[in-house]
């Protein structure tokens, strides 16, 4: 009988007899014996995790709700980049609450991700159309980091320029994040007034400028002349724009913007006490190859049909490493999909209507307040009014509060009110009366814009078919379902991606994210209104600190890569404070994730590679040599544990000692934390800082490429250098727009830890290890396991080596991954960390039946490869090279292949019961990059051309 709640037995796949069979196959009697032979004894935890006992699903939900009920939910019109929204129920129910959408992985395998890819193309089209710039990416983390990425983009476009101007009317949190990013990159940030700044005074050293549109105080400005003067110096112009405002006011592309960034939260996404939200970026065609993040493009499949794919991937961190455009990996795909569905559902006319209604309600409030004698400073506005109330700002905020509303205190003399689509005429009347101190007439009867005609948008947007076809709920529901059916997610099959930890995202964990108590708070509400969510975040931080063995944890980073960057910044700021700011060398093993060198470069560090030996372990002699050679300038080492080769390296504590002895800090990449929890921890090993991927180890879903949270845990000496924020009273080191990053979805991990308890968490780690070793044992005689520990065992993942087979058969590792789609699986991680190999991570959640199904598929694929090698199957026209096979392919009237239709589509009998069909055939990546298409209008033209 389990000593913990029954949730752990529902989360963990193999139970009872299945475990015994798996252990027997490995030659072990108990799980404890297996773990003892895998995890080095000198790093094992001496005591169980000091966490509360597991609760049932019902108990955990009740406890969390009781905590979150301590929040006070008022109507909030603070603005500053965050607004009340209405998520259409059809989108909430069929997308946000649907595991078919939230459990998928990043769409690196386009043949089984066409649904998400289509919606991301819709997202890009929406952004491009609204901003008036031809190219947009498929989301970034938040507006602050998007602005920081734009600064880097400008600098890369003009590498000899070291100065960047930021208008002082940008959102304060954005300015903080930019300052953090610039601190160790040698960029001089000037914050000032656009009207008095002379670009010519900086000249060739000016990389670019950033303005807010409308600005943080609500003013709509015409930047045409300013941008002309900036362009005269050769610098670039960046606009942080509100997409909802762009439905009715002039698009940035019309007045000379080179880059546009912002947040799509206004498009139906709850505020979430700061997140998650999908940021966006668009740019001119000339800058597209410098753009960070994922870019969706169009190509063709083997039948010549149009197919979506990730384009221009050579810009990304997993390929270019420290030379990448950014360290961005996980972004905000699910939120981008939600925002795009919002635009699809409302269409151009619906969006324009919402934008117009917001503005006219704001104008009605303007009219009521001015009639009551309250001065409004901005005459050209969209949704925000700047109240001039000398010495009375605090009193105004208090009056609004007493009436049930939050408004923004700008300074002692000014307050601001930002309305949104949730504002009603009753709200306007109540707010006006409260601020005026008497009953005030505030009829919603305005019918003309309050801005000068020059600011009115003249161009149409979102005219493409996708935005003009699905405006009834029936049509929308079916469109969502059609797209979902094109993607393989965890509700369909195991996703055995190594280093990705695609474990169960349980329904109970997901329930709280739609509670108003969790998702409707503005991140800048008074502290007494957010007691509940801050208590939840504090509990989560404390539990993560105990799990990692660290003194403190910051939840601010919005993704794992952001956590890496934040951790490195903590080290650099600590060293600078200690008078060792010259330390700028980062040692990184050659097996490391691509984000490691990319993050190091962002933190202003020089990357020095460390070799690995023939067994895949870090070459300790080379490490010692490099550490000693760079001891005067050594900042840190970045090390993943267990290693990216799937092995618990026996020398990890020695590694930490060597680095520390030479003046460096140890940064541990927490990507493989799923093999540590409850058995060991970064603090036990000797690390100084570690980031966690809550969307891996702690059960947060991947969302098809985000959202994620990448908190960092640090040792005592680094605690003062955790990320700050304006709302925390110290802004230095801010890496996100909100103090707690994507706060609302932290509830998922709170639930996971509460329901698993210390015993369940340890057992999950042990079972992840057992599952990986079971697969390695069953497949190792066909596909050699490339690296293993001293006793031939692996950690929580294993690298299968098909290189001799693929060489002899004239195949590639891609052929195996694509063929797995015919068997109903997402392929494992390909060619990382070793080219031509497959890295498999089954996680603890997969039952033995699913593991056996995967093993059977790989055994059959081995037989198919062998048939090619011995001449039984054709070397060119075979099931592997032609995979994946679509329903259209196998049902065609003509069949000219030397293998049968059933061999193509139903290679094992289990597929006769249930079959997942790839929506398109193999996608031509080269064609897609040579014929880059990134918006729907050009997709429609492209499709017609392909048909011709």
Curated annotation (Swiss-Prot):
The lineage of its organism: Bacteria, Pseudomonadati, Verrucomicrobiota, Verrucomicrobiia, Verrucomicrobiales. It catalyses: N(6)-[(R)-lipoyl]-L-lysyl-[glycine-cleavage complex H protein] + glycine + H(+) = N(6)-[(R)-S(8)-aminomethyldihydrolipoyl]-L-lysyl-[glycine-cleavage complex H protein] + CO2. The glycine cleavage system catalyzes the degradation of glycine. The P protein binds the alpha-amino group of glycine through its pyridoxal phosphate cofactor; CO(2) is released and the remaining methylamine moiety is then transferred to the lipoamide cofactor of the H protein. It is an enzyme of class 1 (oxidoreductase). It comes from the Bacteria. Its EC number is 1.4.4.2. The glycine cleavage system is composed of four proteins: P, T, L and H. The modification N6-(pyridoxal phosphate)lysine is found at residue 696. Signal peptide: none annotated. HAMAP family: GcvP. Belongs to the GcvP family. This is Glycine dehydrogenase (decarboxylating). CDD domains: GDC-P (cd00613). Pfam families: GcvP2_C, GDC-P. One of its GO terms (biological process) is glycine decarboxylation via glycine cleavage system.
């Amino acid at each position: 009988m389990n000593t913990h709640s029954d949730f752990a037995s529902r989360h963990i796949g193999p139970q009872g007899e299945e475990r015994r069979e798996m252990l027997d196959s490995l030659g072990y009697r108990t799980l404890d014996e297996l773990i003892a032979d895998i995890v080095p004894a000198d790093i094992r935890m001496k005591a169980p995790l000091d966490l509360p006992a597991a609760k049932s699903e019902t108990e955990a939900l009740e406890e969390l709700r009781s905590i979150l009920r301590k929040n006070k939910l008022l109507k909030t019109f603070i603005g500053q980049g965050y607004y009340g929204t209405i998520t259409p129920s059809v989108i909430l129910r069929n997308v946000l609450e649907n595991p078919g959408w939230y459990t998928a992985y990043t769409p690196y395998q386009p043949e089984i991700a066409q649904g998400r890819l289509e919606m991301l193309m819709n997202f890009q089209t929406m952004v491009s159309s609204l901003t008036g710039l031809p190219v947009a990416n498929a989301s970034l983390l938040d507006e602050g980091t998007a602005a920081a990425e734009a600064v880097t983009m400008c600098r890369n476009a003009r590498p000899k320029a070291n100065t960047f101007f930021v208008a002082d009317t940008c959102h304060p949190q954005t300015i903080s994040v930019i300052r953090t990013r610039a601190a160790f990159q040698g960029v001089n940030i000037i914050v000032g007034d656009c009207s008095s700044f002379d670009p010519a005074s900086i000249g060739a050293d000016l990389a670019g400028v950033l303005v807010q549109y409308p600005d943080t105080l609500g003013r709509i400005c015409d930047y045409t002349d300013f941008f002309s003067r900036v362009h005269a110096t050769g610098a670039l112009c960046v606009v942080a724009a509100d997409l909802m405002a762009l439905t009715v006011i002039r698009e940035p592309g019309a007045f000379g913007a080179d880059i546009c960034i912002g947040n799509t939260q206004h498009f139906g996404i709850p505020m979430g006490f700061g997140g998650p939200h999908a940021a966006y970026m668009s740019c001119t065609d000339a800058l597209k190859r410098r753009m960070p993040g994922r870019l969706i493009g169009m190509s063709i499949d083997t039948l010549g049909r149009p197919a979506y794919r990730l384009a221009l991937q050579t810009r990304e961190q997993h390929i270019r490493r420290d030379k990448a455009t950014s360290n961005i990996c996980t972004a905000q795909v699910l939120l981008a999909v939600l925002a795009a569905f919002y635009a699809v559902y409302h269409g151009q006319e619906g969006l324009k209507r919402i934008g117009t209604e917001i503005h006219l309600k704001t104008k009605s409030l303007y009219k009521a307040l001015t009639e009551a004698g309250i001065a409004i400073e901005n005459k050209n506005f969209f949704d925000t009014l700047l109240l001039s109330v000398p010495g009375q700002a605090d009193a105004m905020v208090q009056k609004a509060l007493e009436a049930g509303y939050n408004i923004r205190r700008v300074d002692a003399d000014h307050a601001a009110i930002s309305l949104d689509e949730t504002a009603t005429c009753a709200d306007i009347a109540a707010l006006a009366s409260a601020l005026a101190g008497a009953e005030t007439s505030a009829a919603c009867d305005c019918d003309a814009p309050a801005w000068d005609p020059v600011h009115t948008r003249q161009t149409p947007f979102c005219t493409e078919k996708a935005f003009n076809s699905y405006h009834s709920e029936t049509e929308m529901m079916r469109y969502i379902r059609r797209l979902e059916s094109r993607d393989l997610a965890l509700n369909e099959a195991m996703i055995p991606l190594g280093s990705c930890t695609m474990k169960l995202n349980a329904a109970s964990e997901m329930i709280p994210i739609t509670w108003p108590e969790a998702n409707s708070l503005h991140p800048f509400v008074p502290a007494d209104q957010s007691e509940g969510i801050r208590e939840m975040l504090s509990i989560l931080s404390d539990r993560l600190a105990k799990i990692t063995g660290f003194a403190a944890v910051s939840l601010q980073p919005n993704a794992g890569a952001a956590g890496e960057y934040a951790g490195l910044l903590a080290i650099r700021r600590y060293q600078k404070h200690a008078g060792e700011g010259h330390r700028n060398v980062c040692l990184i093993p050659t097996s490391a994730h691509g984000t490691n060198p990319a993050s190091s470069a962002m933190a202003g560090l020089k990357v020095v590679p460390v070799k690995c030996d023939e067994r895949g372990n870090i070459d300790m002699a080379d490490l010692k040599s490099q550490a000693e050679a760079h001891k005067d300038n050594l900042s840190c080492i970045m090390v993943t544990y267990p290693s990216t080769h799937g092995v618990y390296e026996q020398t990890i504590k020695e590694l930490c000692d060597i680095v520390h002895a030479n003046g460096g800090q140890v940064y541990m990449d927490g990507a493989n934390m799923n093999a540590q929890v409850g058995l060991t921890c970064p603090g036990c090993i000797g690390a100084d800082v570690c980031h966690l991927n809550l969307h891996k180890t702690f059960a947060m879903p991947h969302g098809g490429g985000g959202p994620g949270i990448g908190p960092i845990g640090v040792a005592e000496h680094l605690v003062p250098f955790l990320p700050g924020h304006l709302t925390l009273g110290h802004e230095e080191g801010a890496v996100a727009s909100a103090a707690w990053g994507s706060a609302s979805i932290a509830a998922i991990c709170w639930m996971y830890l509460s329901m698993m308890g210390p015993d369940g968490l340890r057992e999950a780690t042990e079972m992840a290890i057992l599952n990986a070793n079971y697969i390695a044992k069953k497949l190792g005689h066909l596909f050699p396991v490339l690296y293993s520990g001293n006793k031939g065992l692996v950690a929580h993942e294993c690298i299968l080596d098909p290189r001799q087979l693929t060489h002899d058969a004239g195949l590639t590792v891609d052929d195996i991954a694509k063929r797995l789609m015919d068997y109903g699986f997402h392929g494992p991680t390909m060619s990382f960390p070793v080219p031509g190999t497959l890295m498999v991570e089954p996680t603890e959640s997969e039952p033995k039946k699913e593991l056996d199904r995967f093993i059977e598929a790989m055994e059959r694929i081995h037989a198919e490869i062998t048939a090619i090698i011995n001449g039984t199957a054709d070397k060119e026209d075979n099931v592997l090279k032609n995979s994946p096979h679509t329903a259209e392919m196998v049902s065609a009237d003509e069949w000219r292949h030397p293998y049968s239709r059933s061999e193509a589509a139903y290679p094992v009998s289990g597929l006769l019961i249930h079959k997942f069909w790839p929506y398109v055939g193999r996608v031509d990546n080269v064609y897609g990059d040579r014929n880059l298409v990134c918006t729907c209008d050009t997709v429609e033209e492209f499709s017609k051309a392909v048909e011709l």
